[in-house]
């Protein structure tokens, strides 16, 4: 029985990065032997055990064979006869197919160290093309390590393109797809994730609404980058730079979907793209069963982001309607995230990344002014029901008028 550290822990140590999770593979052992040593079984599909002291995962060396469509279409075989090299060959990338023995020696049968040096994300074997989830995983690794100079090897990108064309991506479950997408959006360079999917044809299969934005022009006066797809990539880059949460990053990815519906005759203008994009945002949210907070923010940002850009020009009653659309009195954080997404949109323009966005402070101040209105004096007057609601609305409108006038003097 031999135990090896495998995968990400070996890769990250060699890259000089912090090692957080450690995976282990056990060669030459059976399930009965693991149980006899006090390991606790947890694997439903193949033999994985928890160490009795550390709680870390130890998996028996195994091989896998394609037996059906999709991520789950594999038959696994684990036995004491399976070698370390056989176990490593089923892994996705060479940089993830290295092991380390108990003396700290690296076992690298597929050239992972050379690819680390060359900054290449390269598949281990042609079996890579049997698992559609690997398209998303490789794009996610590209987003994680882009800052270190990593790129996807040309031959691996070709296999990813083959997978995209095969229709296998449609076999991915919404949950698995969302897990990879959400993790990728939180990487240091989420725009690289979308770019890689675009380059290999997978974006057209998974989120055709975003793919449709590439090649669609915008007015150069407002968008020096012109291409809407390029703009979305730049907005995601700003999200990472400003450490925005997942909900903001997801909303920014989808905020301009309506521009993909504009007829070429109307280019580069995109009249009413905000409202036209809402059904597309809803469709993408439903496709991946996106968490409710991300769904709601994406929908609201898509519909109202141009309101944010024009915030300083909005009349008090329009401003009040905007605040009420976000239920800012009970859910202030959602409005704050909307403002953040709108600012990322404004900054995601070529050459304008550092431009001030005074609309952010103005909108947050307006929300504070409206929320500061107390209902108590109105209740004490004996108002209730619809009458109370109307009086509260009038009081908030008055507060916003005063706020706008005060800001106008500043």
UniProtKB/Swiss-Prot annotation:
Residues holding ATP: 8, 11, 91, 137, 140
Superkingdom, taxonomy of origin: Bacteria
Binding positions (CTP): 8, 11, 91, 137, 140
GO BP annotation list: RNA repair; tRNA 3'-terminal CCA addition
Residues at which Mg(2+) binds: 21, 23
Molecular-function annotations in GO: ATP binding; CCA tRNA nucleotidyltransferase activity; cyclic-nucleotide phosphodiesterase activity; magnesium ion binding; phosphatase activity; tRNA binding
Cofactor: binding comment: Magnesium is required for nucleotidyltransferase activity.
One Pfam family of this chain: PolyA_pol
Requisite cofactors: Mg(2+); Ni(2+)
Enzyme Commission no: 2.7.7.72, 3.1.3.-, 3.1.4.-
InterPro entries: CCA_bact, HD/PDEase_dom, HD_domain, NT_sf, PolA_pol_head_dom, PolyA_RNA-bd, tRNA_CCA-adding_enzyme
Subunit text: Monomer. Can also form homodimers and oligomers.
Name of the protein in question: Multifunctional CCA protein
PROSITE patterns xrefs: HD
Domain called HD: residue spans: 228-329
Gene that encodes the chain: cca
Keywords annotated in UniProt: ATP-binding, Hydrolase, Magnesium, Metal-binding, Multifunctional enzyme, Nickel, Nucleotide-binding, Nucleotidyltransferase, RNA repair, RNA-binding, Transferase, tRNA processing
């Amino acid at each position: 029985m031999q135990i090896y550290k495998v995968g990400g822990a070996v890769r990250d140590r060699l890259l000089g990065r912090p090692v957080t999770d450690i995976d282990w593979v056990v060669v030459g052992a059976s399930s009965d032997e693991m149980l006899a040593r006090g390991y606790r079984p947890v694997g439903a599909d193949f033999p994985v055990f928890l160490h009795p002291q550390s709680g870390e995962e130890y998996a028996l060396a195994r091989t896998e064979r394609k037996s059906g469509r999709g991520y789950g279409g594999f038959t696994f075989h684990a036995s004491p006869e399976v070698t370390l090299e056989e176990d490593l060959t089923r892994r996705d990338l060479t940089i993830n197919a290295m092991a380390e023995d108990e003396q700290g020696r690296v076992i690298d049968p597929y050239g992972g160290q050379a690819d680390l040096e060359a900054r290449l994300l390269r598949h281990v074997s042609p079996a890579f093309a049997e698992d559609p989830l690997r398209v998303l995983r490789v794009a996610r690794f590209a987003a994680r390590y882009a800052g270190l100079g990593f790129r996807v090897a040309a031959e691996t990108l070709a296999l990813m393109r083959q997978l995209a064309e095969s229709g296998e991506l449609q076999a991915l479950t919404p949950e698995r797809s969302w897990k990879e997408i959400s993790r990728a959006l939180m990487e240091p360079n989420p725009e690289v994730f979308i770019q890689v999917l675009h380059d290999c044809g997978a974006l057209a299969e998974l989120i055709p609404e975003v793919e449709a934005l590439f090649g669609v022009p915008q007015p150069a006066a407002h968008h020096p980058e012109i291409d809407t797809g390029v703009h979305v990539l730049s907005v995601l880059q700003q999200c990472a730079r400003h450490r925005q949460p997942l909900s903001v990053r997801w909303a920014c990815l989808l905020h301009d979907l309506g521009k993909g519906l504009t007829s070429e005759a109307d280019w580069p203008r995109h009249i009413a793209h905000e409202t036209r994009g809402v059904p597309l945002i809803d469709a993408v949210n439903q496709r991946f069963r996106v968490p409710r907070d991300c769904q709601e923010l994406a929908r609201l940002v898509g519909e109202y982001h141009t309101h944010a850009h024009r915030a300083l020009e909005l009349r008090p009653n329009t401003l009040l309607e905007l605040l009420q659309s976000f239920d800012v009195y009970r859910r202030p954080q959602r409005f704050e995230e909307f403002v953040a997404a709108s600012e990322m949109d404004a900054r995601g323009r070529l050459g304008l990344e550092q431009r001030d966005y005074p609309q952010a402070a103005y909108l947050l101040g307006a929300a504070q002014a409206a929320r500061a209105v107390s209902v108590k004096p109105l209740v004490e007057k004996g108002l209730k029901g619809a009458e109370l609601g109307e009086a509260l609305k009038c009081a908030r409108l008055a507060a916003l008028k005063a706020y706008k006038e005060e800001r106008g003097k500043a």
